[in-house]
């Protein structure tokens, strides 16, 4: 707000992900990406970093992520910034994280982990819709799931034709 890049009272799209930074610093830890470094959680609105918190390179990306997000969301809200949509990858697909996210936005999109419990249901889905995403053609569909008891969410499923003509499904 102080730089004039974001406007109080306006709604924004919010992206969150962990960035892996290779470094040889003495306190850096090995990452699951097989190099030594840091992996801070980074929150972005448009081209603007609105939150960043470091964590050890070898810490699971879900570790206390809900606390990091709560601090970032609260700081934005205290400054009159409202979040319309949140986008996150599968590293944020946990009940604790979803509970925090849903309280601070109108809509959220979190890529789910592959889940064998839903895999068979994917093959009986009808009405797949073809969409091009970043130049790649996907087929999309959705189902309502209760991954966490008593909390139904819409799961969007995408699949892509492989060159060997079999289909790949993932949630």
Task: Kindly label every feature range from the protein language model.
Residues 25, 94-101, 119-123:
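A short acidic (Asp/Glu
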Residues 1-42:
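Active-site-proximal, Lys/Arg-enriched surface segment
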Residues 107-171:
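An anionic, glycine-rich sequence signature occurring as long contiguous blocks
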Residues 19-21, 55-57, 91-93, 113-115:
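Active-site beta-loop-alpha junctions enriched in small/polar residues
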Residues 12-20, 47, 83-93, 108:
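Short, conserved catalytic/metal-binding motifs centered on acidic residues
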Residues 7-8, 80-82:
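Short helix-loop-beta connector
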Residues 78, 98-107:
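Short, surface-exposed basic-aromatic patches at helix termini and helix-loop junctions that form
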Residues 31-79:
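Electropositive, glycine- and tryptophan-enriched low-complexity nucleic-acid-binding patches
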């Amino acid at each position: 707000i102080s730089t004039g890049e974001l406007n109080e009272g306006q709604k924004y799209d919010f992206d969150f992900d962990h960035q892996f930074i290779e470094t040889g610093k003495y306190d850096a830890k090995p990452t699951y990406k097989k190099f030594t470094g840091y992996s801070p959680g980074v929150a972005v609105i448009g081209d603007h970093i609105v939150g960043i918190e470091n964590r050890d390179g070898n810490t699971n990306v879900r570790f206390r992520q809900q606390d990091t997000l709560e601090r970032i969301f609260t700081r934005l809200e205290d400054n009159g910034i409202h979040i319309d949509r949140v986008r996150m990858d599968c590293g944020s697909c946990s009940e604790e994280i979803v509970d925090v996210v849903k309280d601070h936005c109108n809509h959220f999109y979190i890529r789910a982990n592959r889940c064998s419990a839903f895999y068979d249901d994917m093959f009986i889905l009808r009405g797949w819709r073809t969409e091009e995403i970043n130049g790649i053609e996907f087929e999309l569909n959705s189902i309502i799931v209760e991954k966490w008891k008593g909390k139904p969410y819409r799961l969007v499923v995408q699949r892509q034709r492989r060159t060997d003509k079999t289909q790949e499904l993932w949630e």
